[in-house]
Amino acid sequence: MSKEEAIEVEGTVIEPLPNAMFRVELENGHVVLAHISGKMRKYFIKILPGDKVTVELSPYDLTRGRITYRAK
């Protein structure tokens, strides 16, 4: 059984939360809870409110995601 493909969407960080979690507003208006991917943690990439980010969403739970990229 293979994993389902993740859905990649663009969004804007609204507010930081404890434990490297962020509330992100997607381009379609939905608000999701997202955490930082492991590589971003490893290389200490900082994310601030207002940053444009790419979020991966699981097809099973569209309310939570993983931040995989921060736009410059």
UniProtKB/Swiss-Prot annotation:
It comes from the Bacteria. It is found in: Cytoplasm. Keywords: Cytoplasm, Initiation factor, Protein biosynthesis, RNA-binding, rRNA-binding. Residues 1-72 form the S1-like domain. GO terms for molecular function: ribosome binding; rRNA binding; translation initiation factor activity. SMART domains: S1. InterPro entries: NA-bd_OB-fold, RNA-binding_domain_S1_IF1, S1_domain, TIF_IF1. GO terms for cellular component: cytosol. Its main location: cytoplasm. PROSITE patterns: S1_IF1_TYPE. SUPFAM superfamilies: Nucleic acid-binding proteins (SSF50249). Component of the 30S ribosomal translation pre-initiation complex which assembles on the 30S ribosome in the order IF-2 and IF-3, IF-1 and N-formylmethionyl-tRNA(fMet); mRNA recruitment can occur at any time during PIC assembly. Belongs to the IF-1 family. One of the essential components for the initiation of protein synthesis. Stabilizes the binding of IF-2 and IF-3 on the 30S subunit to which N-formylmethionyl-tRNA(fMet) subsequently binds. Helps modulate mRNA selection, yielding the 30S pre-initiation complex (PIC). Upon addition of the 50S ribosomal subunit IF-1, IF-2 and IF-3 are released leaving the mature 70S translation initiation complex. This is Translation initiation factor IF-1.
